[in-house]
Amino acid sequence: MNKLIGILEDDEGIRDILQFLLLEEGYEVECYTTVNNFLTKKDSNPDLFILDVMLPDGNGLEVCKMLKSSPKTSAIPVIMMSAHADLQQMNSACRAEEFVKKPFDIFAMLEKIVQLLNKDNPLAH
């Protein structure tokens, strides 16, 4: 079974590019445009989350804190991304594994995703 990646991003362009690239790489992808939309998908169990910080109905940092404090999701890697936030401030606000400043190099992002998904199995994917 392919790895599932959950993307919480309100910017359609960024969301579509990430989704297209990840699907091309063989991953399954679920996209969410708002915090509320994300929170209603409790049945989903992604292998990695990519979260934007600034969202129309909330804050990705708060979502990250929630994910990292839940026993069900605390071990799932999180990549935070933002065009505006200070990366050091983001690091102290939640326990995400990676922080990416927008705009970002899509291939560097893919490399981070592969590393996080395969950190326990370097020969996977």
What are these regions (language model features)?
Residues E62, H84-K101, E111:
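Alpha4 helix (beta4-alpha4-beta5 surface) of REC/receiver domains from two-component response regulators
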Residues F104-Q115:
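C-terminal output helix
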Residues T34, N59-E62:
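Acidic catalytic/metal-coordinating carboxylates
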